[in-house]
Amino acid sequence: RQMCIRDRFSPDHITHTRFSGEIELGIFEKEMELPGGLKKKTGLHHVTLHNCSIGNNSLIENIPNYIANYQIGSDCFIQNVNLILTEGESCFGNNTEVSVLNETGGREVPIYNRLSAQLAYIIAMYRHRPDLIARLREMIEAYSLAQKSCYGKIGNGVHIVNTGTIRNVYIGDYCQIDGTSRLENGSINSNREAPVYIGPNVTAEDFIVSSGAHISDGVVMSRCFIGQACHLTHLFSAHDSLFFSNCQSENGEACAIFAGPYTVTMHKSSLLIAGMFSFLNAGSGSNQSNHMYKLGPIHQGVVERGSKTTSDSYILWPAKVGAFSLIMGRHVNHPDTSGMPFSYLIEHGNRSYLVPGANLKSVGTIRDAQKWPKRDKRTDPDKLDCINFNLLSPYTIQKMLQGIDTLQGLKQTSGETSECYSFQSTTIKNSSLNKGIDLYTLAVHKFMGNSIIKRLEGAPFANLNELHDRLKPTDSLGEGEWIDLSGLIVPKQAVKDEIDRIVGNPDSTLEETESFFQAMHRRYYDMEWTWVCSIMPRWYGKTVDRLSPGDIIRIVRQWNEAVVSLDRMLYDDARKEFSMISRIGFGVDGSTRQRDFDFEQVRGEFENDAFVKMVCKHIEDKTALG
């Protein structure tokens, strides 16, 4: 019906091409260099275009069917793609409802291009505020309607080769799609700073993929949101699931999960189902059940941040596991250990045993805390998720304080000589209870001392008044309970205030809520200090404005003793990895001496291990600082 061509247009590099509908063509002047060094002139060859616009210097060739209703940018390479079309009006995956946590519905999260882990958490978990959910749905629907179009878009610098069908998909700049089977109703939010790769045999429908993601090798997904820098490969399958920044999923299966930042599952036999996770490391054969064969798959579970599941672990939902816990064995009695962070949850004799605080002295916990920031693969300057990596924070310390009270209460009610204590469908041994109190106490001393030292560091003061001025809180927020919004650690009151603002203001926007999360993330340490000041009367018996230099000295000494004690526990735990048992299988055909030499060649010497050196230096530095 109509064809628009740009200045300097030449048809010399258009062959075996059919046009219909409204067509707009750029110029074809440059050569494109392909992998292996092959150079091709840009142009159109063996392709049928209907209602399409093509930018400058793109190469499109060998399209068996056709391309319809697409705006294609400049410098694109599209080759051997069966079919690319937009059919009817589409929001390109925006406002797709994902039945997360409960497969039968009730916690649906409508996904959109800029969905953050924090907003998704509120939509999924705050169903006790139907007014809030209704307002957020309205805002997301309005955003999605703004994306609606009869034309799909393929951005600049996109490569699509050897691919099957692409239907109703928005494709951002510099995306690479290679050997993909089928993509339907979605958005791929690639950009120059953080390109997206969609690889061989991927099938996806009703999805949104964020910048920097890598999806390849037979992944099958339906009704999913994939966050920034996520990595899904090796036949992984998922439906009705949300994956946020830096998740890594391979081989296994996910059904209706809320995978907060750094959720990692790598093994074929692992099934994550109907659970909320973040900073998770799932061992091989890790499984859960959300179905008791009565009213359907209606149960859910929460594994708080930083937890690990060992090989063949199993949890029968509903259950709730505390932050930074280790889960070993099968647990079918619905434990709630959220009040006991850094614990071991171990099955023995068909009973769930809890070892409070045991993970505080585990070298693996500290390694995790160090590696998470280093493994942040997000290169997009516009980061959607707010991520706090701190092991010790008001969120975990408040739970330890509650844990100390709970453990001491168990001793009083059941007697100090009791062999075992019952707690939330778990059993705590007497020795574990007493060690748990000691470990939690050390951790609180470490956190409180850290906070005070950081507050005073680099700030000279000449008298007591100047000391108190420096210690005075500078943020009005921070007192009371803190919560973990899937990566963002924040005062509960601040979230409540934001919810009230959203509900009470009919003109509130998604951008304002994004800004709120970012502001809370920036203000974390100021709010943390406000919280520290609020618990000083309980922990030290004095308010912050009553602390004397002698009190500061005492606090720093307690901090130093706690830090060094915990570091020595880590040192001893690391030494176990170099024990005689760890050497079994080394020097397979040699003598004992050859076994030890083989071990040292492969694993190195204990004193030269990088982590061991770090712990030793940490002990020296903190001792000197103290």
Kindly give the residue locations of the regions a language model identified:
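Short, small-residue-biased leader/transition segments that mark boundaries at the very start
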Residues: 1-5
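Glycine-rich hexapeptide-repeat left-handed beta-helix
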Residues: 6-28, 32-44, 61-143, 178-179, ...
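Phosphate-/polyanion-interacting regions in eukaryotic proteins
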Residues: 18, 43-137, 161, 167, ...
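A charged, amphipathic alpha-helical module
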Residues: 138-155, 160
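Core alpha-helical transmembrane segments of integral membrane proteins
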Residues: 154, 158-177, 182-193
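Long, compositionally biased intrinsically disordered regions
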Residues: 348-626
